[in-house]
C-alpha cells in the first residue's frame, strides 16, 4: 500500500492505495475509526483487486472542515480523491458511518459505482432517540469527556463472546478515539444527525448491492437487520454468524471472501 496525502476538493486527505488491479475496492471506515482499522483486512483483498483506504475528513489525519461534515460533502470528497488517484469506477464498501457516506456517493455518483456494500450499516435515517444520543455525545466531547466514548464504544462493537479474544484490537480502537480531534468527532456527529433516509434511492439504484450483517450486532439489532433485508430484495445478503458490528475483524476471511465474490460478480 502506497501512502499519499492529497487535496480532494477543499479537503486535505490521507489515502493509502495498492495501485494495482483491474477492479478497485474503496474501504470507508466507521465513526471513531480511521483507515488503520482495515490494516489486517486489506491483505486479504489486494492480491485480487486494487484497494484504496482513506481517513474520512474529521477522523485520522485528514483535516476537519467546519462544524458539520454532511454525508454529501464527504461523498464529494471521496469522488474528488478518486479523481486525483485515477480511479474512474469502484466498488464502495462502507462500514457503519462509512456506509452512510457510501450511500451518499451512490446517490450522487451512480455512474462511477461498480457496486455498493453496506458493512454493518443501514440506509435508514436516525430515529429521534438516536439523534438525542448523538447530541449527548456531542455534549460529552465538548465538555472534555471523550474518554467516556473510548471506554464504551469500541468494546460494544464486538460480540460479547469475542471481546476477550480481540482485547488488543479494542484497546487500539480506544487509542484511536483519544487521538481523534474533538472537532472532527463533532462534525461527523452533526453530519450523521442530518443525514436522510436512502431506501428509495437503493430501490432505484440499479447497481449491485451487498449487505454484510452480523448476527450478534448490538448496534444493528435483529429487528432492524431483518427489516432492512426484507425491504431490499434487490440486495444480496451475507450474514456473519459469529460477529457483532466489526465483522471484518471478527470474521475477516468470511467477510473478505463475500466481498471478493461480490466484486467478481
Language model features with spans:
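Flexible "cap/lid" loop of the alpha/beta hydrolase fold
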Residues: 103-108, 113-148
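Alpha/beta-hydrolase fold catalytic core
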Residues: 1-25, 46-50, 83, 87-88, ...
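Conserved acidic catalytic loop of the alpha/beta-hydrolase fold
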Residues: 73-90
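Short beta-strand/loop motif that positions the catalytic acidic residue
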Residues: 205, 211-213, 217
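Conserved alpha/beta-hydrolase catalytic His-Asp/Glu region
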Residues: 126-132, 144-204
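Catalytic histidine-centered segment of alpha/beta-hydrolase-like enzymes
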Residues: 243-252, 256
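Conserved HGGG/HGGXW glycine-rich cap/lid loop of the alpha/beta-hydrolase fold
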Residues: 11-67, 71
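Gly/Ala-rich beta-loop-alpha elbow adjacent to hydrolase catalytic centers
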Residues: 94, 98, 102
Amino acid at each position: 500500500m502506497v501512502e499519499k496525502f492529497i487535496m480532494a476538493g477543499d479537503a486535505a486527505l490521507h489515502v493509502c492505495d495498492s495501485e494495482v488491479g483491474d477492479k478497485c475496492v474503496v474501504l470507508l471506515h466507521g465513526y471513531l475509526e480511521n483507515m488503520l482499522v482495515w490494516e489486517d483486512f486489506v491483505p486479504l483483498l489486494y492480491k485480487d483487486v486494487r484497494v484504496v483506504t482513506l481517513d474520512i475528513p474529521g477522523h485520522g489525519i485528514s483535516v476537519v472542515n467546519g462544524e458539520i461534515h454532511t454525508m454529501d460533502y464527504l461523498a464529494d470528497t471521496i469522488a474528488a480523491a478518486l479523481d486525483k488517484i485515477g480511479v474512474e469506477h469502484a466498488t464502495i464498501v462502507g462500514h457503519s458511518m462509512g456506509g452512510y457516506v457510501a450511500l451518499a456517493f451512490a446517490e450522487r455518483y451512480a455512474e462511477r459505482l461498480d457496486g455498493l456494500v453496506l458493512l454493518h450499516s443501514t440506509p435508514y435515517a436516525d430515529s429521534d432517540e438516536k439523534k438525542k444520543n448523538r447530541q449527548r455525545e456531542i455534549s460529552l466531547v465538548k465538555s472534555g469527556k471523550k474518554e467516556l466514548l473510548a471506554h464504551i464504544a469500541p468494546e460494544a462493537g464486538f460480540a460479547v463472546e469475542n471481546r476477550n479474544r480481540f482485547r488488543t484490537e479494542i484497546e487500539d480502537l480506544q487509542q484511536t478515539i483519544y487521538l481523534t480531534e474533538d472537532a472532527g468527532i463533532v462534525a461527523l456527529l452533526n453530519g450523521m444527525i442530518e443525514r436522510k433516509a436512502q431506501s428509495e434511492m437503493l430501490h432505484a439504484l440499479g447497481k449491485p448491492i451487498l449487505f454484510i450483517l452480523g448476527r450478534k450486532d448490538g448496534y444493528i439489532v435483529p429487528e432492524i437487520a431483518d427489516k432492512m433485508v426484507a425491504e431490499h430484495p434487490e440486495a444480496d445478503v451475507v450474514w456473519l454468524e459469529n460477529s457483532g458490528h466489526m465483522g471484518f475483524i471478527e470474521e475477516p476471511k468470511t467477510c473478505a471472501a463475500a466481498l471478493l465474490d461480490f466484486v467478481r460478480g
